[in-house]
A protein has these predicted regions:
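Active-site acidic/histidine proton-transfer and metal-coordination neighborhood
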Residues: 14, 67, 93-205, 296
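Acidic/histidine-rich catalytic cores of soluble enzymes
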Residues: 168-264, 271
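C-terminal segment of N-terminal export signals and the immediately downstream linker at the start
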Residues: 23-50, 55-59
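Conserved, mostly hydrophobic/aromatic
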Residues: 40, 60, 68, 85, ...
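N-terminal secretory signal peptides and thylakoid transit peptides that target proteins
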Residues: 1-16
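Hydrophobic faces of well-ordered beta-strands that scaffold small-molecule active sites
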Residues: 36-41, 68-70, 92-95, 117-119, ...
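Acidic-and-aromatic substrate-binding clefts and catalytic sites of carbohydrate-active enzymes
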Residues: 46-51, 69-80, 96-104, 124-127, ...
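Acidic (Asp/Glu)-rich catalytic clusters
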Residues: 32-33, 57-62, 76-92, 103-114, ...
Length: 310
């Protein structure tokens, strides 16, 4: 807010616009851990969006969120999504893409105004659906857990390729982690480190999913410090504690999700490192299932928790 006050003395027009935003979203006046708006990854409210797209976006904005990370939708044209975002007062700076290539995501990202295109999960070779047109998720989870160091080198090469295509289109490609990249490999190496070291920094940035990294037994603050120039975005989520690190995504392997502050992850050192790394955007993302607290209630708990940290 100090910056906004300085701008008040210089650009009155900008102040009027900011004032209008703050009246629409009073909670935007509150401090937050990184000194910039708290975003929401729309995956968190996927089920609600399927039932009422525009109404759910409005409820997201009513909580106080002003920024979102969306996904490429096969159900809604990019122009329609952009109109719905604008109507709700939400800015989409980042777009998640599926397990295939980046080609379909580039025009979608440009239409909705996104700067980043982030690969949710990257395979050495994109998986193909079965005869029924569906992906066998059980087989997919098993494949993720069986990746070798050579597979991760192929993943890095794919990231560089997608990064080049994004850059040529005026966008920035990024890699998003889960927990499986931290399954120990031969010689004590980790797939995630292979991807970091074998991708071109000018083509590939990283979105650090702090929750998944912590669930795998690794320290997001340590990575943000060691590779501070590689990160542009964060996913903020929490999990209930487990007896051992989790490095699998199958229902039996993954930890139980929790609202922020109700799990085991200490975000204070993570945000301290993120400030030094000049993170541009950060998004609350809570994993399903929402067995005790509905998603729209959970995102308010998450939002209020982050503001209370300051």
């Amino acid at each position: 807010m100090a910056s906004s006050r300085r701008e008040f003395l210089i650009v009155s027009g900008g102040t009027l616009a900011a004032s209008a935003l703050n009246l629409a979203h009073p909670s935007a006046l509150r401090a937050n851990p990184l000194g910039r708006p708290i975003g929401l990854e729309l995956y968190t409210v996927n089920a609600e969006l399927d039932k009422d797209y525009e109404g759910t976006l409005k409820k997201v904005a009513e909580v106080g969120y002003t920024e979102i990370e969306a996904g490429v939708s096969t159900k809604r044209a990019a122009a329609d999504a952009k109109k719905a975002f604008d109507t709700a007062g939400l800015k989409c700076h980042s777009l998640h893409i599926g397990m295939g290539g980046i080609e379909e995501a580039i025009p979608y990202a440009k239409e909705v105004g996104a700067k980043y295109v982030i690969s949710s999960v990257t395979f050495p070779v994109p998986p193909k659906p079965g005869p029924d047109g569906k992906i066998d998720m059980k087989a997919l989870f098993a494949q993720l857990s069986s990746f070798t160091l050579d597979d991760y080198k192929l993943i890095a090469a794919r990231c560089n390729d997608m990064g080049k295509k994004a850059k040529d289109a005026g966008l920035q490609f990024g890699y998003h982690n889960h927990n499986f990249e931290f399954k120990p490999q031969s010689g004590g190496a980790y797939g995630y480190d292979i991807i970091l070291k074998n991708t071109n920094p000018s083509l590939v940035t990283f979105e650090l999913d702090c929750g998944w990294m912590a669930a795998a037994g690794h320290d997001p603050a340590e990575y943000l410090t060691k590779y501070s120039n590689r990160y542009s975005l964060l996913h903020i989520k929490d999990f209930h504690p487990t007896d051992a690190p989790s490095t699998g995504l199958s229902p039996d392997d993954r930890p139980k999700p929790a609202e922020l502050g109700r799990g085991h992850i200490d975000y204070k050192p993570i945000f301290a490192a993120a400030k030094k790394a000049n993170i541009e955007y950060y998004y609350v993302e809570q994993e399903p299932p929402f067995t005790t607290t509905p998603a729209l209630e959970a995102i308010k708990i998450d939002y209020d928790y982050l503001h209370a940290m300051v």
